[in-house]
Regions:
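Extended alpha-helical scaffolding segments used for macromolecular assembly and cargo binding
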Residues: 1-106, 115-123, 165-174
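Alpha-helical repeat/alpha-solenoid scaffolds of the HEAT/ARM/MIF4G superfamily
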Residues: 101, 111-170
Length: 174
């Protein structure tokens, strides 16, 4: 990273980004969240908005992983720098889900529970899992009755033998 200002070739920038991403992920997996954020921030600094077109997956990964490292290291003031452009440039709702999860987790960690719920409800609705504006005991009872009715002729063994969920929208909503 120290000689990065001397790099002229885009392929070398890509390689340097990949190395910083790898170092950031290793640091994160070792619970060294501050170091992870440093590496991922460095990778972020080597990119620009053109990367959303030319290196979309890498750019999205940098934004998502850096946002998560900022959250895990409690550097909440840095979240917007990664999340806002990530949400703006992500090509699909499924590409945005991990960013929304990090944002909601950070809100909860900061005691902003109502904001987290308000932010996630429209996302869940777009994923096909709408929630009422104000869930009451009645809503919960109705949903439990629906569930019991749907499972009325199903044994635990049958449930255990069901195939794994494969619908990306339902997986993302969980």
């Amino acid at each position: 990273n120290l000689g990065s200002e001397l790099i002229q070739d885009e392929d070398e920038f890509i390689q340097l980004c990949q190395l910083n991403i790898q170092a950031g992920m290793r640091a994160k997996n070792s619970t060294a969240y501050h170091a992870a954020l440093d590496y991922l921030s460095k990778a972020f600094s080597f990119t620009n908005d053109q990367w959303w077109e030319s290196h979309y997956d890498m750019k999205l990964s940098i934004h998502t992983d850096a946002a998560e490292a900022a959250y895990l290291s409690h550097q909440f003031e840095k979240l917007d720098m990664f999340i806002d452009p990530g949400l703006k440039h992500a090509r699909s709702l499924l590409d945005k889900v991990d960013l929304y999860i990090v944002l909601a987790s950070a809100m909860v960690a900061q005691g902003k529970l109502r904001e987290a719920v308000d932010m996630t409800k429209p996302v869940l609705a777009q994923l096909g899992h709408p929630y009422p504006a104000f869930a009451t005991k009645k809503h919960v009872i109705i949903e439990l009755i629906k569930l019991r009715w749907a499972l009325r002729n199903t044994s635990i063994a049958q449930i255990l033998n069901l195939p794994e969920m494969s619908d990306a929208r339902h997986i993302a909503a969980n």
